Regions:
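Catalytic Tyr-x(3-8)-Lys segment
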Residues: 212-239
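Canonical Rossmann dinucleotide-binding motif of NAD(H)/NADP(H)-dependent dehydrogenases/reductases
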Residues: 1-14
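Short, small/polar-rich loop/turn modules that mediate ligand/substrate recognition or access, typified
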Residues: 192, 256-258
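Rossmann-fold cofactor-recognition segment
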Residues: 30-46
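A glycine-rich helix->loop->beta "capping" turn
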Residues: 32-36, 53-67, 72-79, 101, ...
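Catalytic loop of short-chain dehydrogenase/reductase
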Residues: 71, 76-109, 125-188, 200-201
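Short, flexible catalytic-loop segment of classical short-chain dehydrogenase/reductase
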Residues: 197-208, 212
Length: 275
C-alpha cells in the first residue's frame, strides 16, 4: 500500500508501527521520499494520542487513513477428522480449544478490532480538516473526493470454516461490521469508510497457509493453487492490492462509501461463507 501511494506521488505518507526496523524496511522500498515513520502501538490510547500529535505537527490534514494492522494469534481450530473420516471426540475438541489462554483470544480481538476502532477515532480531527479544505462546488464539475478511512479486514470474516483460528475469523467478521457502522456514523460528517477483504496474499501472516499447501514463493502465477481452492488459481499480487488502494484513493473511488471490497480471486465463491 505504501509503495503504491508513494509511486503515485502523494505529498506525505505517515506510517505507524511498533517496530522501527519494520518501518525502515518499508521506507527502503519507496522511491519518492514521501514516507514518514512514527512508532506507535495501536492497542494503547496514549500511544495513539502521541502519534496523532506527531502527525498533526507535520501536516494540517489527512485525506486518507488506512487501518491495516492485524495479527492471527496462535492456532485455534477444531481437530481434524481421522483418515477414515471419523470425528474426534468432542472432549478432545473442547480440551484443545479451552486450553488456549483467553488472553491469546483477546489479543487478536484487541489488535484487529479495538485497535482499528481507536485508530480511526484518534485521527478524526485531521480527516475533518481535509474536508474543510475542499473548494466550493462548481456546477457540473466533479469535486475532489471527501476524506476517507480504509480498514483492512479479510475474507476470513465471511468464512464459516476455521482453517486457522476462531479468534482471527471472529475478529475479521467484527472488523467488517465495524466498517459499516463507522460509515453510517460518519456519513453526515462527510467522512467515508470502506473496507478491503483480501484473500490469500503472500505475507508474514499467510506464509504458514502457503507452506501447509505445499506452495513455494509468492504463488502469483496461474496454476499455483488448485481451481477448487482459488478459481483464479493464484494468490494475490502486490499489483492487485496496489490497484485497489490507488483506485479507492482517487477521484474514481470518490463515490464509494460503506463498501467491503473482496480481492480474493474468487475464493469466497467456492468456500462455505456468509458473504
Amino acid at each position: 500500500m505504501t509503495k503504491a501511494l508513494d509511486a503515485n506521488k502523494v505529498s506525505k505518507i505517515f506510517i505507524l508501527g511498533r517496530r522501527e526496523n519494520a518501518l525502515q524496511e518499508t521506507i527502503s522500498q519507496t522511491i519518492n521520499g514521501t514516507v514518514i515513520p512514527i512508532q506507535c502501538d495501536i492497542t494503547s490510547k496514549e500511544s495513539l494520542e502521541t502519534a496523532y500529535n506527531a502527525v498533526a505537527a507535520q501536516t494540517t490534514h489527512v485525506d486518507l487513513l488506512i487501518a491495516n494492522s492485524g495479527v492471527m494469534g496462535p492456532p485455534m481450530k477444531p481437530p481434524q477428522p481421522a483418515e477414515d473420516g471419523s470425528l474426534p471426540p468432542l472432549s478432545q475438541l473442547r480440551d484443545e480449544l479451552f486450553n488456549i489462554p483467553m488472553e491469546e483470544f483477546n489479543t487478536v480481538m484487541n489488535v484487529n478490532v479495538t485497535g482499528s476502532y481507536y485508530t480511526v477515532l484518534a485521527f478524526l480531527p485531521l480527516l475533518e480538516a481535509a474536508n474543510k479544505r475542499r473548494p466550493a462546488p462548481q456546477e457540473d464539475v466533479l469535486a475532489a473526493p471527501t476524506a476517507q478511512v480504509i480498514i483492512t479486514s479479510s475474507i476470513a470474516g465471511f468464512s464459516r470454516k476455521v482453517p486457522f483460528s476462531f479468534a482471527y475469523n471472529a475478529s475479521k467478521a467484527a472488523t467488517t461490521h465495524l466498517v459499516k457502522m463507522l460509515s453510517t456514523a460518519f456519513a453526515y460528517y462527510g467522512i467515508r469508510v470502506n473496507g478491503i477483504s483480501p484473500g490469500l496474499y503472500s505475507s508474514d501472516m499467510a506464509d504458514h497457509i502457503f507452506r501447509a499447501s505445499g506452495i513455494q514463493g509468492r504463488a502469483i502465477s496461474d496454476g499455483s493453487f488448485p481451481k477448487e481452492m482459488i478459481p483464479a488459481t493464484r494468490g494475490g499480487s502486490e499489483e492487485d492490492l496496489a490497484g485497489l488502494i490507488v483506485w479507492l484513493a482517487s477521484n474514481s473511488g470518490g463515490y464509494i462509501n460503506g463498501n467491503i471490497l473482496l480481492t480474493d480471486g474468487g475464493r469466497i465463491s467456492v468456500a462455505p461463507a456468509v458473504y
